[in-house]
Amino acid sequence: MKDTVMAYLLENSIKFKGKPNPKAAMGKILGENPDLRSNVKELNEVISEVVKEIESMSLEEQQAKLDELAPEGLGQKTERKRKEIELKNVKGNVVMRFAPNPSGPLHIGHARASVLNDFFTKKYNGKLVLRLEDTDAKRVLPEAYEMIQEDLKWLGVKVDEVIVQSERLEIYYEYGRKLIEMGHAYVCDCDAEEFRNLREQGIPCKCRDTTPEENIALWEKMLAGELENVAVRLKTDIVHKNPSIRDFPIFRIERTPHPKNGTKYHVYPLMNLSVTVDDHLLGMTHVLRGKDHIVNTEKQEYIYNYFGWEIPEYVHYGILKIEGPVLSTSKMHAGILSGEYSGWDDARLGTLRALRKRGIRPEALYKLMVEIGIKQADVRFAWENLYAANKDIIDKDARRFFFVESPKKLVISGAESKKIDLRMHPDRNELGNRELLFDGEIYVSDDLEVGTMYRLMELFNIVIEKIENDVIYAKYDSDDLAVAKSNKASIIHWIPVKDSIPVTVIDENAEKIEGFAEKDFAVVNEDDFVQFERFGFVRVDEKEDNGYTCYLTHK
């Protein structure tokens, strides 16, 4: 492990002129060496040890050590071969579905199901159905119908057919009637609390033994709007070991106006009925769902068996544990309405729109979800892995610039004006150079101490003389990098005061970081990716006359 960590940290250190950045290296180490994820604690200890070793080396020694450990370069390392995930019992055409509720745009949790369904239907040349499950009017956000399709297009998910459940109510009525006629379902007017008490004891309610003819008459009254506080229940096993499976409801009365249907309908199917009917009629061969749906699978199998339908191949995967951003659609919507969040793409939210705004590329998210796969074990969503995958995509095109946050003015005496040329990208000469002109006054972001030597990146050494009225004064000391090393001088980045460009960076907590970028930052355009050296990758969101607004993508 140590040699692997050493190689990555050396590469990182050389990129930053001899000073390793362990946080930046961590994501890449885990992204390219997933076997180390299971021992992050030991990995952190090794990183701390290796950082101390690297900091004691000169830049030349670091390069020599890296050449020894990775003579062909880390970029040439052959990637670990992953066993591609597969479906069981593939016979002929594969048909699958992604079935969100249109209560808002898609978030990271939705990405797993949509990506995996897309991956398999592409792998087997199958068909993917987008089914919008909108039979609960209280949970429907009208604009979400389009937002979901836009999100899937951005993510690279190819939808072959779109189904909206609220447009299929007559179909559900037909199969509800059949279940009643066959004696497998009944209309129940029991008080909810009363039924719950009986169910817990495994005792049938008074409605269970009514005849199909009596239930059809009640069903017709339900459809005509003549009944309230009733439900249609499916007959299952009244003493089933799981009380929730005992005679569960499949239709209910709902008076809330529907965004698509208004008040035309007031009998709506519950999920287990509508899902089963749709999965059969649409020819689903495989159904991917979280293991929290195992009970629903058992409920739906009752309906399959009553109709004599073929049951699709179910795949139940583990829970994806996502820490950090807000994922609750209701909380997000409430926060937007109250003004707490700026919109569905607020950086604090876990929506795909927020990730897109921050600069996460869809290819990176897609790749990570395929890697997470369909394992039954619960898995933690590793942000560092997403960032590593994203960096692999954007790094090659991201031009480099200096950015000084919370800028402090530094006036240097005893040094002549000097122009330095830096490459826009360390590996791509064709992106050209950028120019920094030192003329005595610069901005820095570090808190500097009087009497201490510092090295200005790519420039020279200075010693701080005094700090007055928030202005730092220093004198030129020397050009030699060896002098800085012998004095253990910190290396700080800087930009000239003259022609500096105001930049606001919005981080993942929606906090605004104010600062200045160098003058050549003016060449970038909206939606470009750049790397602010020693700060992180950012996506340029707005370019205006008075400055730029960027979003922090990741370190």
Swiss-Prot record:
Function: Catalyzes the attachment of glutamate to tRNA(Glu) in a two-step reaction: glutamate is first activated by ATP to form Glu-AMP and then transferred to the acceptor end of tRNA(Glu).
Keyword DNA-binding: no
GO annotation, biological process: amide biosynthetic process; glutamyl-tRNA aminoacylation
Recorded superkingdom: Archaea
Reactions catalysed: tRNA(Glu) + L-glutamate + ATP = L-glutamyl-tRNA(Glu) + AMP + diphosphate
Keywords: Aminoacyl-tRNA synthetase, ATP-binding, Cytoplasm, Ligase, Nucleotide-binding, Protein biosynthesis
Main location per the UniProt record: cytoplasm
Name of this protein: Glutamate--tRNA ligase
Enzyme kind, highest EC tier: ligase
Family statement drawn from the similarity comment of this UniProt entry: Belongs to the class-I aminoacyl-tRNA synthetase family. Glutamate--tRNA ligase type 2 subfamily.
Motif ('HIGH' region): 100-110
UniProt GO molecular function: ATP binding; glutamate-tRNA ligase activity
PANTHER family: GLUTAMATE--TRNA LIGASE (PTHR43097:SF5), GLUTAMINE-TRNA LIGASE (PTHR43097)
GO CC, alphabetical: cytosol; protein-containing complex
Subcellular location: Cytoplasm
Keyword Hydrolase: no
EC identifiers of the protein: 6.1.1.17
Organism the protein comes from: Methanococcus maripaludis (strain C7 / ATCC BAA-1331)
Lineage: Archaea, Methanobacteriati, Methanobacteriota, Methanomada group, Methanococci
